[in-house]
Swiss-Prot record:
Belongs to the ATP-dependent AMP-binding enzyme family. GO terms for biological process: amino acid activation for nonribosomal peptide biosynthetic process; antibiotic biosynthetic process; secondary metabolite biosynthetic process. Gene3D superfamilies: 3.30.300.30, ACP-like, alpha/beta hydrolase, N-terminal domain of ligase-like, NADH Oxidase. It comes from the Bacteria. GO terms for molecular function: lyase activity; oxidoreductase activity; phosphopantetheine binding. This is Indigoidine synthase. InterPro entries: AA_adenyl_dom (IPR010071), AB_hydrolase_fold (IPR029058), ACP-like_sf (IPR036736), AMP-bd_C_sf (IPR045851), AMP-binding (IPR020459), AMP-binding_CS (IPR020845), AMP-dep_synth/lig_dom (IPR000873), ANL_N_sf (IPR042099). SMART domains: PKS_PP (SM00823). Nonribosomal peptide synthetase involved in the biosynthesis of the blue pigment indigoidine. Catalyzes the synthesis of the blue pigment using L-Gln as a substrate. Two glutamine molecules are cyclized and oxidized to form indigoidine. The modification O-(pantetheine 4'-phosphoryl)serine is found at S972. Contains only one module with an adenylation (A) domain, a thiolation (T) domain and a thioesterase (TE) domain at the C-terminal end. Contains a putative oxidation (Ox) domain integrated into the adenylation domain.
Length: 1282
């Protein structure tokens, strides 16, 4: 026998060669044995034969004969078994029509197969009638059972089926587009069942779980196993996708044999309940490549069970080869398990793709299969049959052999087995190389973190490049994620902004509404001291270690450090200022370089969900009571009063706000809150000695929650008390130090125990890179050492608090050593991998485990310590996807490295449980960065301004206004710089989170314009300063839209905030005021909200000069002082004489002068071809709004509201009498633009107590705020003495 065959050429079953004959034989052998079970229903072999014979009788009566297709439209049930065997007994072929299939596919299968009779369950009949052609007869088992054969007719005989008769037709998808029906004959499936019986004892001793959807070929040996005498347990609908439901079924029915795809097998293992299936003896894995890693996991999880890897296209009748896995051979070998040797009666041939000649051992070729299990062909598709079922002359002069062309690649192993090498049609030309996608998928699946993987190629619509995208599902056992097994997507992918948004919302604080009616006491020391600010910003999570080498002396100095006090006193002796100073350490610290506020202590996830409540009497001059410390406003808020006892006390009750942490963390919530409490207590222990004080644990009294008015769900964490300092105390912590690869001078790599001021070698085993949280692994590699702290506190409530205290102490060192936490234990059975690893190390050395905290560290530079930005957070922005890609570099050539790795919670599966690559390719996750959005150039001035900053920040050219910031490569660090630059350039005060909430140029522009348009913000801050200098208030020109004042606000450089005043009427639903007097009155009311008292600095541009003048007059009449009134270009630009001489100041579109001025409000010019086109085409407000919207990209409704404001105010003039009675005491300066008409003040007198300063500018009415703004700024700064 040649290597190309290696099989028994004759079928193993002799004599009876049809399925009905085999079943009849089993009925004769054990008629009362259970043939099929479904939930609590059972059928014996005799009952199955009887019911299927009755159905066959009815079908024969309806005209069914050999090779006819009869549809089977039933859900998993006993009806399915009776239906399949009844159709076979009638001599026909059954066509599985799974009700789970899409209706279009079902409709196609029915029509293409020319099926005329379909058996359906009663409840599915109405649905089937909508799918099937009208000439199709629908029958039910109820009808067949009621059928009585007419007298004089004979019942059908089982012998009506022959070995070459069709047994069933399976529709399978392929590269040809439409599904095609594969015709399987009795002799083929009989051979398959005979092989299963002889090779793997699928016989009366076995209980088979039928869980594969019946429309797939692999389901057929499950359904037809009664022919071998086995009992078949029908799984519930959808159980193939429910690992835990499968396990329950296996246990309930004592299933011995299970068939599943590797994806499902991984799911069963990950449940950790798979070992409960004690009855299970055999696991058949097929349908996808079985990775060596999964095989190892399976044999370790289910020792003693047979694991068989099977392979076979539908066209070769289910399984054409198999390979029993030997656990002893799994330590080495290829990444995927061999598909083994051909089944009985089947031959394998691996041929060169070009010559169709056999290849040698180790050479890759295309697999062809021959033998008795080959399908007859494709139903009604002779063309496809001829393409795939070929007559090939394997040797010169030899008789041609009928072979099926699989399209799969393989190679012979030295032992005569076959190694699957991917699909011939799954090779792509990428980056100049021919790449096998299955090879990449298998390589990724052998990564410890990866549960399942698939690789696809997608084109980038903009660049035209091909992107290789790896889609992965993380292993719940191996991937080190926070909230392992219960994690949200934000732990697997750093594209999620969930955690950042939570952090920005101050989730741990009490709501302001809760505190509004309670007495609040402002504490002294709201402005932190330089020492406080420096030490708080020095206390950060360090992810870079740039300070050089670490020595043994450094570690001993770190671990031996103590804080001493020069004196001791009681808390009652604290002055109010000292109490404020102490608590200021626990408040927020803000830096313009950071997206998030900073605290002096660490908090898991930076959520700061632990609250402090002070129970005070005789301290700080406060009345006895329970006070909440509000860290943003540096206040103590009285929650409830306390009856005076005459004894001074200062106790601190710690409360964990569940709602503040639960959106981000699901596991170990209590533990992380207790650790955070420890960090806070540790901070107290560091700062109190300077005041002669210390903090001691006092009691665990959960009843105190009732006095603090907190939510029932919130956690009481413990009570501490401020006491006189009495010297150093035992910290109840046991410390182990591990050194990394020669990075600590004097200490070789290993585990050391710190005791009595010395480090003693404890073990060679250390926490490894893979044992820390995935996103921290690159930091681990940079770290010089790691520290494990074990809590030996006696009281349960103090155990995790002790851990946080110790790390806080170590963080606040003066040795330039920085740390990052990397794992902790759990009270609730969810320890992180570092904890499990250290427990094993301790256990191997006879030391009991306890609550623990692990962190890595290294030396940091002075620059790092002093930095107030977010540089240390940059590493933390890399998630498991990026880290896995880094690891792929070590075992894949560079041209096979994916451009992206996309993490899925679960990869989509097809109905037969395989990874659905088409669904992956169409998924939102894959296409998030590839979506071919149309390029939309910036349209408005605001969009153009934002785009310029955007492109610079992201280092991208030609940004579309619809590009997503984060999908374009942005992150939190870049967001900080982007927002700061936007605020400076545009004179606005966008909050840092605005990029998170409005992540496109378009949305940012809308947000900016919307905020400008809000009535609550009619005084729009165009330039922000943090000092206390009085602001400049400036009114814009006609239309009242202040954005054209941004350049002036940004260029003036007075160290003062600059507000532009938006007219009432710009916002939707507002009606402009009817007089300047009313306008000024309402503006003063809004002004008082910003600046309650004078002196006021008022400026006005163009028409805004009139409003500024009236506002100054009304303020002075109210007794306020105006220190400067600047009237900038108070005259109107001169329009063409013919445009204004007839209509004067009438606001009418018939008045070409008015239309010209209105045009200039939006364009900043009163000439040019656009104006000419406007004057020619515009006839009313609606047409003008449409014209401007098209010209400038402004919203039509906003344009109409601005037009309305202009129309109302265009005619505003002071009468001679009104102006005569208005005399201002404020100094007035008039800046006249070249070419303007006279203003409302000229040719008048008496309006100013002092002669005004008049400055003639070279700039015109519009350029003075644009290209010539430098001239105006120079004159203003000179007048102000700048």
């Amino acid at each position: 026998m040649t290597l190309q065959e290696t099989s028994v050429l004759e079928p193993t079953l002799q004599g009876t060669t049809t399925l009905p004959g085999l079943l009849a034989q089993r009925v004769a052998e054990h008629p009362e044995a259970i043939a099929v079970a479904y939930r609590d229903d059972k059928l014996t072999f005799r009952e199955l034969a009887s019911r299927s014979a009755a159905l066959a009788d009815y079908l024969e009566h309806l005209g069914v004969s050999a090779d006819d297709c009869v549809g089977l439209f039933v859900e998993p049930s006993i009806d399915l078994m009776v239906g399949a065997w009844g159709i076979l007994n009638a001599g026909a072929a059954y066509l599985p029509l799974s009700p789970e299939y899409p209706e279009d596919r079902l409709r196609y299968m029915i029509e293409n197969s020319e099926t005329k009779i379909i058996l359906a369950q009663q409840r599915l009949v109405s649905r089937l009638r909508e799918l099937a052609p009208k000439d199709v007869t629908i029958v039910t088992l109820r009808e067949s059972e009621a059928f009585v054969r007419p007298e004089g007719t004979e019942a059908p005989a089982a012998r009506s089926a022959r070995p070459d008769t069709l047994a069933y037709v399976i529709y399978t998808s392929g590269s040809t587009g439409k599904p095609k029906g594969v015709m399987i004959e009795h002799r083929s499936i009989v051979n398959q069942l005979g092989w299963l019986r002889e090779t793997y004892a699928i016989d009366r001793s076995k209980v088979i779980l039928q869980k594969t959807p019946m429309s797939f070929d692999a389901a057929q040996w499950e359904i037809l196993s009664p022919a071998n005498g086995a009992t078949v347990v029908m799984g519930a609908p959808g159980v193939y996708a429910d690992p835990e439901g499968l396990i329950e079924t296996i246990v309930k029915h004592n299933v011995t044999t299970l068939q599943c795809v590797p994806t499902l097998l991984q799911g069963l293992i990950d449940t950790e309940k798979f070992p409960e299936c004690v009855s299970l003896q055999q696991i058949f894995s097929g349908g996808e490549a079985l990775s060596r890693l999964l095989a190892i996991q399976t044999t370790q999880e289910m020792p003693g069970r047979a694991l068989i890897n099977v392979y076979g296209p539908t066209e070769t009748t289910i399984n054409s080869s198999s390979f029993p896995v030997d656990p002893a051979d799994l330590d080495e070998g290829p990444q995927s398990i061999s598909i083994g040797s051909p089944v009985h009666g089947t031959t394998y041939h691996i041929l060169d793709k070009e010559t169709l000649k056999p290849v040698g051992v180790g050479e890759i070729g295309e697999l062809y299969i021959g033998g008795i299990q080959l399908a007859r062909g494709y139903l009604h598709r002779d063309d496809l049959t001829a393409e795939r079922f070929l007559e090939i002359e394997l040797e010169e002069g030899a008789e041609p052999v009928r072979l099926y062309k699989t399209g799969d690649l393989g190679q012979w192993n030295n032992d005569g087995t076959v190694q699957f090498a991917g699909r011939a049609d799954n090779q792509v030309k990428l980056r100049g190389y021919r790449v096998e996608l299955d090879e990449i998928s298998l390589a990724i699946e052998n990564h410890d973190w990866v549960r399942n993987a698939a690789v696809i190629v997608k084109n980038d619509g903009r660049t035209g490049f091909q992107n290789l995208i790896a889609c992965i599902e993380l292993s719940e056992k191996e991937a080190a994620l926070m909230d392992q097994g219960n994690h949200g997507s934000h732990h697997a992918s750093k594209k999620s902004k969930l955690q950042v948004k939570a952090q920005l919302s101050n989730p741990g604080l009490r709501d302001d509404a809760e505190l509004a009616a309670r007495p609040a006491f402002d504490l002294e020391g709201a402005e932190p001291t330089p020492e406080q600010r420096a030490r708080v910003f020095a206390r950060k999570t360090y992810r870079f270690y740039e300070g050089g080498a670490v020595t043994q002396a450094d570690l001993l100095g770190l671990l031996g450090a103590t804080v001493t006090a020069g004196y001791s006193r009681k808390a009652a002796d604290l002055a109010p200022a000292e109490l404020g100073q102490i608590l200021r350490w626990f408040g927020q610290y803000i830096s313009e370089e950071r997206l998030l506020p900073k605290y002096g202590y660490a908090s898991p996830g930076a959520l700061y969900a632990t609250q402090m409540y002070f129970e005070l009497e005789g301290v700080g001059g406060l009345k006895p009571g329970y006070y909440y410390y509000q860290p943003v406003r540096h206040q103590l808020v009285l929650i409830s009063e306390r009856e005076a006892t005459g004894k001074a006390t200062a106790q601190i009750h710690f409360i964990g706000k569940k709602s503040g942490i639960e959106p981000v963390y699901k596991n170990n919530i209590l533990e992380v809150l207790e650790i955070e409490t420890g960090h806070m207590v540790g901070l107290f222990e560091q700062i109190l000695p300077a005041y002669g004080l210390d903090i001691h644990d006092r009691a665990y009294e959960p009843a105190v929650k009732d006095l603090l008015d907190v939510a029932d769900e919130d956690y009481y964490l413990g009570t501490f008390e401020l006491v006189p300092h009495a010297g150093a105390r035992d910290d109840q912590a046991e410390v182990y130090v591990q050194t990394h690869g020669g990075k600590v001078a004097g200490l070789p790599e290993g585990q050391y125990r710190y005791e009595n001021g010395e480090l003693t070698r404890f073990s060679d085993d250390i926490v490894l890179k893979k044992h820390v949280i995935a996103i921290n692994q690159s930091v681990y590699q940079a770290a010089s050492f790691g520290i494990s702290v074990y809590s030996r506190a006696e009281e349960e409530w103090l155990k995790y608090i002790t851990l946080g205290k110790k790390l806080q102490h170590l963080m606040m060192n003066g040795l330039n050593l920085g740390f990052m936490s990397s794992g902790y234990s759990s009270k609730t059975g969810n320890p992180l991998p570092a904890s499990r690893r250290m427990d094993a190390v301790l256990g191997a050395n006879g030391v009991d485990s306890a609550p623990m905290y692990f962190f890595v560290g290294g030396r940091i530079s002075d620059e790092q310590i002093g930095h107030e930005g977010m540089r240390e957070d940059s590493v933390h922005m890399r998630g498991p996807a990026e880290l896995i890609r880094d690891d792929l570099v070590s075992f894949l050539p560079d041209y096979m490295i994916p451009n992206r790795v996309v993490v899925f919670d679960r990869l989509p599966l097809s109905a037969n449980g395989k990874i659905d690559v088409k669904a992956l390719a169409a998924s939102d996750q894959v296409n998030a960065e590839l979506v071919e959005r149309p390029f939309v150039a910036p349209r408005t001035e605001t969009e153009k301004e934002i785009a310029a900053v955007w492109e610079k920040a992201l280092r991208r050219e030609n940004a579309s206004v619809q590009d997503d910031f984060f999908e374009s490569g942005g992150n939190s660090l870049i967001a900080v710089g982007l927002v700061r630059e936007l605020n400076a350039r545009l004179g606005v005060s966008l909050p840092l989170q605005s990029v998170l909430e409005s992540p496109t140029i378009e949305k940012l522009a809308r947000r900016l314009e919307r905020e400008v348009a809000q009535e609550s913000s009619r005084f729009v801050r165009l330039h922000a300063e943090t000092g206390k200098a009085r602001p400049v208030i400036c009114w814009p020109g006609l239309g009242g839209y202040p954005m054209n004042l941004r350049s002036l606000a940004g260029e003036i450089g007075l160290g003062r905030s600059f507000y532009g005043v938006q007219s009432y009427g710009i916002n939707e639903g507002e009606t402009p005021y009817e007089t300047i007097t009313e306008m000024a009155k309402k503006d003063i009311e809004a002004l008082k909200e910003i600046q309650p008292a004078g002196p006021y600095t008022l400026w006005g541009y163009s028409f805004g000069a009139r409003v500024a003048f009236e506002t100054a007059y009304q303020l002075e009449q109210a007794g306020e002082k105006v220190d400067n009134l600047f009237l900038i270009a108070p005259g109107s630009p001169k329009v063409r004489a013919e445009n204004g001489k007839v209509w004067g100041r009438e606001a009418s579109f018939a008045n070409r002068g008015y239309t010209t001025i209105l045009f200039s409000v939006f364009t900043g010019t009163i000439s040019g071809p656009d104006l000419d086109r406007c004057l020619e085409t515009v006839t009313d407000e609606a047409s003008f709004a449409e014209f401007i919207s098209e010209l400038k990209g402004i919203d039509v409704d906003l344009a109409r509201r601005i037009i309305s404001v202009v129309g109302q105010t265009y005619e505003f003039e002071y009468s001679f009498h009104e102006l005569a009675e208005r005399t201002l005491q404020a100094p007035i300066s008039i800046f006249k633009a070249v070419g303007d008409d006279y203003s409302f003040l000229e040719n008048s007198s008496g309006y100013s107590a002092e002669p005004p300063t008049v400055i003639d500018l070279d700039a015109d009415h519009y350029s003075l705020l644009r290209e010539d703004i430098g001239e105006l700024v120079k004159h203003i700064r000179y007048l102000l003495g700048e």
